[in-house]
Regions:
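Sequence-level preference for short, compositionally simple segments enriched
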Residues: 31-335
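Bacterial Sec-dependent N-terminal signal peptides
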Residues: 1-33
Length: 335
């Protein structure tokens, strides 16, 4: 007959307790919620978007969707790098609004203040947003980012990005981003950054005489910003807008089959007072229509593509080797 001492019994009890706790934690992690609801009126799981994000599983192996009920969510939101495979889904962009009012002078973090002014910052890969408005309502006070995206494989569908200067910071040297059926407005350089980004069927709205894009495409990248089947519009009285200027030496921006209003300047592009960048940037156009699309007076260092050259500006080639089918995020288009 085996007789345990008090010490042995205590040790066995402790081991059993530790084993039970370990199994409980495994079960808890295996059963994490993949659908979370946010509602201002308290009818959901959380009343704050950030609180909902902070309570999701880190590095989940299954996609997590946060459903956001209609309301104005006045908060600064950050999707951390460990919040991958996350979707934020609103009811519709007209009444599901995330807004904040940080700007360069308010943040006061020296020369890098711009990058801290975001309303929504996305760092987690495989991110998706639908039916949302993301707004920086600081006004015309200088740099004030509404949406900042550093993540790879980020998708925005039926969203509005509202602001003035630097509305959308599409950043990340290795970031690939897709925007479909979105509305993006601003004043100066309101779409800027280093990402490879495709804008499909979007409305790009200029609120003042200035510049739409300021790409900082890394050297060696085949694509930077590509606007496909987009509409370029402007506020009343706005009639002197450039398609873009190079934030860095190897900026790449292309407008393909877009409708351009009369606010687009005849020369189209600006060198940002750096003539040497005319040799290294790639600013391209093909098949555009409207009064702003005439290429007769375009700067000589821009590129009017042939039909053959324009064919490479399709989703497969832009995002290669973006694993589109497995992501179930974006339909693959073929020539």
């Amino acid at each position: 007959m085996l007789i345990m001492t008090g010490l042995e019994l205590k040790n066995n009890t402790m081991r059993l307790l530790i084993t039970c706790l370990f199994l409980w934690h495994l079960a808890a992690f295996a059963q994490y919620k993949t659908e979370i609801y946010v509602a201002k009126d308290g009818s959901g799981d959380f009343t704050s978007i950030q609180e909902a994000i902070d309570n999701t599983k880190s590095f989940p192996d299954k996609p997590i969707t946060i459903f956001i009920k209609a309301g104005v969510y006045q908060e600064k939101v950050k999707v951390h790098a460990w919040n991958n495979n996350l979707t934020l889904k609103g009811e519709n962009p007209e009444n599901t609004i995330i807004r904040w009012d940080d700007h360069f002078k308010k943040i006061n973090r020296a020369r890098n203040s711009t990058f801290h002014t975001y309303t929504l910052l996305v760092q987690g890969d495989n991110f998706r947003a639908e039916n949302l408005t993301i707004e920086n309502f600081a006004g015309e006070v200088g740099q004030a980012v509404a949406l900042s995206v550093e993540a790879d494989r980020a998708v925005f569908v039926n969203c509005r990005m509202l602001g003035n200067q630097d509305t959308l910071y599409a950043d990340g040297a290795n970031s690939r981003q897709y925007y479909e059926d979105c509305y993006i407005e601003g004043t100066t350089d309101f779409i800027f950054g280093a990402a490879t980004a495709l804008f499909k069927n979007c409305v790009i709205h200029s609120k003042s005489n200035s510049f739409i894009t300021a790409a900082s495409t890394p050297e060696g990248r085949n694509f930077g910003f590509v606007f496909l089947d987009c509409e370029l519009t402007a506020a009343p009285g706005v009639d002197k807008v450039y398609l873009g200027r190079p934030w860095r030496d190897f900026a790449k921006t292309a407008f393909i089959n877009c409708e351009m209003g009369p606010h687009i300047r005849p020369e189209g592009w600006d060198n940002w007072s750096s003539p040497e960048r005319e040799k290294t940037t790639l600013y391209a156009e093909f098949g555009n229509t409207g009064p702003g699309a005439s290429n007769e007076k375009r700067v000589p260092w821009s590129h009017q593509l042939s039909k053959k050259q324009a064919k490479k500006y399709n989703m497969d080639k832009i995002f290669e080797p973006f694993l589109l089918p497995s992501m179930n995020l974006i339909p693959v288009e073929n020539d």
